[in-house]
Amino acid sequence: MPSSSSRPRLQLLEPNLEILPAYAEALGRGWSPNNVEDVSAAQLAEIGRDPTEFITELLRQGGTFRLPDGTLVPKLPDRLRWMWDGELVGHIGLRWQPGTDALPAHVLGHIGYAVVPWKRRRGYATEGLRLMLIEARRVGLRRVEITTDRLNIASCRVIEANRGRLVEEFVAPRFGPDVRLRYCIDLVEQGHDATEEERS
């Protein structure tokens, strides 16, 4: 595993046309930014039709989206970022309800992420989550929930490395029968740990 000093610095970048080819290449290699369903083929088709519109739709606020069970629900405010180290590392997103730390029942957590297979086991997910927690504080959240599959030990370690504490095991029928873990990260307790990125 490369040391943190030798590894290129991770950035969270807003999706844009300049790095879209790297994103499309990852999709073409079978990676999906969605952990619940494989959207790689659908997104590749959208990029092929109109790359600019694809980026616009990714970043569009408001509107609705369809859950895996077909239910149409309002889209929450969100921040979508691509993890980048000179190459595409993966996807990470933050969603929230203004004025509250609570989430609707159909939203599994505030933050979701997916690292491309060839960049895993390098600490990128841990660092990406740390950077996104800074964004969560900036939008006023005092605590965030993150969920993961019970068998996803790597994801559990990523969350726990960012001070996540296990709250419960649960099943979300809309998203399948698998048992999931719900973690909570208290951001207020981390306020004294503000980094240079957060102060800038």
What are these language model-derived features?
Residues A136-T148:
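Conserved GNAT acetyl-CoA-binding A-motif
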Residues T147, R163-L181:
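Conserved catalytic-core motifs of GNAT/GCN5-like acyltransferases
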Residues E18, I153-A154:
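Short alpha-helical
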Residues G112-V115, R121-R138, C156-A161:
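Conserved acetyl-CoA-binding loop-helix of GNAT-fold acetyltransferases
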Residues W96-P98, R150, F170:
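Short, well-ordered turn and helix-capping elements at secondary-structure junctions
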